[in-house]
């Protein structure tokens, strides 16, 4: 679908040699014992691309206890995306049975504005190129604040007005009827206004 095609495009032509999903994962600073919520998880590529790093962090030891070391809940408004994410992550974690990896995944259909989670449930919420799709960005951020534990962290990403300018011009030159982005989503939540929007909900924005 469109999401998978866009991920391929970014992976194939990005100037960031580290790769987008490894970079996002690095910003999350995941440690043992974390409870994590990803909203708008898509097909689960964030976790599939970083499955080795996650396995290293989640490897069980004598200090881990009986509870799952890392709990990850993936949500998306699309049942199809949740189905894809479940399948992709199941395949990526097939080898974990023999390796004592203490990480659990849960998958649910839910919107950004109504996650269905309890108050103060998560140490980390991830919204990777998602917030600008929400009907009401401020309502979605209120929901994120509600489900984060005190001291919890939101890692979110967006883009700016100059995003993919070169390929947009190339495609437009080929056929002006083709538009890579029908809506200017960066106007809703982008690099130019994102920090201002976030500061209405969070005291510390980096």
Regions found by a protein language model. Give the residues of each.
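Class I SAM-dependent methyltransferase SAM/SAH-binding core
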Residues: 35-114
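A short SAM/SAH-binding and catalytic strip from SAM-dependent methyltransferases
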Residues: 124-138
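Class I S-adenosylmethionine-dependent transferase superfamily signal
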Residues: 50, 144, 198
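Conserved class I S-adenosyl-L-methionine
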Residues: 1-34, 45-49
